[in-house]
């Protein structure tokens, strides 16, 4: 496993910040699955009251690809939720 490219991490942070501006929280859990030899990230989006909006789990052996997958999902969720009241 190599080092995470800083541009991918910056894009991930920018995607989470867009959701924070909508008063939503992004909860991030990560672990390594030794059986499948993949890094795993579970993302949950909740409102400030703790009500679950959506959740998704991502698996990949490459951290850059994993963070790109998470960033794409967060941006997609932002596009869906920005007009939601």
Curated annotation (Swiss-Prot):
<dbReference type="GO" id="GO:0006260">
    <property type="term" value="P:DNA replication"/>
</dbReference>
<keyword id="KW-0244">Early protein</keyword>
<keyword id="KW-0945">Host-virus interaction</keyword>
<dbReference type="InterPro" id="IPR020147">
    <property type="entry name" value="Phage_T7-like_1.2"/>
</dbReference>
<protein>
    <recommendedName>
        <fullName>Inhibitor of dGTPase</fullName>
    </recommendedName>
</protein>
<dbReference type="Pfam" id="PF10922">
    <property type="entry name" value="T7-like_gp12"/>
</dbReference>
<keyword id="KW-0235">DNA replication</keyword>
<comment type="subunit">
    <text>Interacts with host dGTPase/dgt.</text>
</comment>
<comment type="function">
    <text>Plays a role in increasing the intracellular pool of dGTP. Interacts with and inhibits host dGTPase/dgt. The complex made of the host dGTPase and gene 1.2 protein creates a GTP-binding site of high affinity. Subsequent binding of GTP to the enzyme-inhibitor complex inhibits its dissociation.</text>
</comment>
């Amino acid at each position: 496993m190599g080092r995470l490219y800083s541009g991918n991490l910056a894009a991930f942070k920018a995607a989470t910040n867009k959701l924070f501006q909508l008063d939503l929280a992004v909860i991030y859990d990560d672990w390594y699955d030794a059986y499948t030899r993949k890094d795993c990230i579970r993302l949950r989006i909740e409102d400030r009251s703790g009500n679950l909006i959506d959740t998704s789990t991502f698996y990949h052996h490459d951290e850059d690809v994993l963070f790109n997958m998470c960033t794409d999902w967060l941006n997609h969720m932002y596009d869906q939720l920005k007009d939601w009241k």
